[in-house]
């Protein structure tokens, strides 16, 4: 199995390191033709407007959207969650827009408002998951086809819809491998 990581801006190296710890081969994605070489893809955290612009500039936006709609497993963290959302509150920024969610950007506040919290995520295990939130979004609305996996103060911070998994937090910034393992075992192999 080979997982692509969008490698234009943001925390792509940290995702690669986490996947390597799980024994998963990775490929840095920067060109549309690379999409045929992977079994799943991660869209990392970073700055969603910048990543969206770069996806357009590198002619990756449409091919990536088509591959995801055709069933390519995708995991979007923070900015990646924003880019996968069909709707972004008060924004018309470029996005992939494949997941039936509405998100609010920087919803937990600015950089100084970043925080960590232990999350209950039964889908990934009984023990709480340490979640790192940095200028994080959250999900305002989901369609019935979207499974809510985790909340913080009644705000949705992790969800899944078929081949699409999103989190408002950064699992790649902790030593806990369970979220990435869930993506590989349940989303990629579970389809």
Swiss-Prot record:
InterPro entries assigned to the protein according to its UniProt record, in alphabetical order: Class_I_gatase-like, PdxT/SNO, PdxT/SNO_CS
CDD domains per record: GATase1_PB
Entry keywords, A to Z: Glutamine amidotransferase, Hydrolase, Lyase, Pyridoxal phosphate
Entry GO terms, CC: cytosol; glutaminase complex
Superkingdom assignment: Bacteria
Pfam families, alphabetized: SNO (PF01174)
Binding site for L-glutamine: 46-48, 105, 134-135
PROSITE patterns, A to Z: PDXT_SNO_1, PDXT_SNO_2
Catalytic activity reported: aldehydo-D-ribose 5-phosphate + D-glyceraldehyde 3-phosphate + L-glutamine = pyridoxal 5'-phosphate + L-glutamate + phosphate + 3 H2O + H(+); L-glutamine + H2O = L-glutamate + NH4(+)
List of catalytic residues: 78, 170, 172
Protein known as: Pyridoxal 5'-phosphate synthase subunit PdxT
Species: Carboxydothermus hydrogenoformans (strain ATCC BAA-161 / DSM 6008 / Z-2901)
């Amino acid at each position: 199995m080979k997982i692509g990581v969008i490698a234009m801006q943001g925390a792509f190296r940290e995702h690669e390191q986490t996947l390597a710890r799980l024994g998963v081969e990775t490929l840095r994605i920067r060109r549309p033709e690379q999409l045929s070489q992977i079994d799943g893809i991660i869209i990392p955290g970073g700055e969603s407007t910048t990543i969206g612009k770069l996806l357009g500039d590198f002619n990756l936006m449409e091919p990536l959207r088509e591959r995801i709609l055709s069933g390519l497993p995708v995991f979007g963290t923070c900015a990646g969650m924003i880019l996968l959302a069909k709707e972004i509150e008060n924004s018309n920024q470029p996005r992939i827009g494949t997941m039936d969610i509405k998100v609010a950007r920087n919803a937990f506040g600015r950089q100084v408002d970043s925080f960590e919290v232990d999350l209950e995520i039964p889908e990934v295990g009984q023990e709480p998951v340490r979640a790192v939130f940095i200028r994080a979004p959250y999900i305002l609305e989901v369609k019935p086809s979207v499974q809510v996996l985790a909340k913080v103060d009644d705000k949705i911070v992790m969800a899944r819809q078929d081949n699409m998994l999103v989190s408002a937090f950064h699992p790649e910034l902790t030593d806990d491998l369970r979220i990435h393992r869930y993506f590989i075992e349940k989303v990629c192999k579970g389809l």
